[in-house]
Amino acid sequence: MSDVLPAFWAVIPAAGVGARMAADRPKQYLQLGGRTILEHSLGCFLDHPGLKGLVVSLAVDDPYWPALACAHDSRIQRVEGGAERSGSVLNALLHLHAQGAADDDWVLVHDAARPNLSRDDLDKLLGELMDDPVGGLLAVPARDTLKRVDKHGRVLETVDRSLIWQAYTPQMFRLGALHRALADSLVADVAITDEASAMEWAGQAPRLIEGRSDNLKVTRPEDLEWLRQRWSNRR
């Protein structure tokens, strides 16, 4: 891994509502350690010297963003989010193109509700992929025994976990290649769950970079409680 890391753009799709949290606001605006989850997710990028700029995709009627201190940071640009994650990311990429970003610029897409990204993992991703022809993503090898089930919840088989990884973020790809993959997949009405799946559909093979397992995405209330306890123990 090189000591000289590449410059990059960051994209944070933050237009979702996080219904599984059953909270009074989108999960990215819930509190964690005195700040919102979204502020923590943005912070690792804003503190990085390689950041060229950051685009956050937000719901049109988002009432929470303007109250955040980072909403006035000149390095952050806001765009309208889409109905799905892929649309939100595509809107951000179109905005970067309009601002003069080049097709071969690196773009890192990170979940708005993944607040515990470490600087070491970010630097590892940048260093390992800076010369990669495709790009890739942080990921973690599956640890638990995995079962494939039928529609009734009955086990069909045990899956070989040595071949299974959990996809995390950031996911790092060239701006032009990711833009084409997302745009074409939307036209083809292909189900895209993350940026890597769009690149896979386009015929590419993203590289997995092993990261920390505590870079978890807040999806359920117990995820947030786990992070709160962990952060409290750091004090």
Curated annotation (Swiss-Prot):
For this protein, what reaction is catalysed?
A: 2-C-methyl-D-erythritol 4-phosphate + CTP + H(+) = 4-CDP-2-C-methyl-D-erythritol + diphosphate
The UniProt site entry described as Transition state stabilizer is assigned to R20, K27
Sorted alphabetically, which keywords does the UniProt record give?
Isoprene biosynthesis, Nucleotidyltransferase, Transferase
Which superkingdom is the protein from? Bacteria
InterPro entries attached to this UniProt entry: IspD, IspD/TarI, IspD/TarI_cytidylyltransf_bact, ISPD_synthase_CS, Nucleotide-diphossugar_trans
Pathway of action: Isoprenoid biosynthesis; isopentenyl diphosphate biosynthesis via DXP pathway; isopentenyl diphosphate from 1-deoxy-D-xylulose 5-phosphate: step 2/6
Q: What class of enzyme is it?
A: transferase
- What Pfam families does this protein's entry cite? IspD
Site description Positions MEP for the nucleophilic attack, residues in chain: R161, K217
GO biological process entries = isopentenyl diphosphate biosynthetic process, methylerythritol 4-phosphate pathway
Question: Which Gene3D superfamilies does the UniProt record give?
Answer: Spore Coat Polysaccharide Biosynthesis Protein SpsA, Chain A
Q: List the disulfide bonds.
A: none
- Under Enzyme Commission nomenclature, its number is 2.7.7.60
Q: Which GO terms describe its molecular function?
A: 2-C-methyl-D-erythritol 4-phosphate cytidylyltransferase activity
Which family does the record assign? Belongs to the IspD/TarI cytidylyltransferase family. IspD subfamily.
| Role played | Catalyzes the formation of 4-diphosphocytidyl-2-C-methyl-D-erythritol from CTP and 2-C-methyl-D-erythritol 4-phosphate (MEP).
Q: What is this protein called?
A: 2-C-methyl-D-erythritol 4-phosphate cytidylyltransferase
**Which organism is this protein's natural source?**
Pseudomonas fluorescens (strain ATCC BAA-477 / NRRL B-23932 / Pf-5)
Underlying gene? ispD
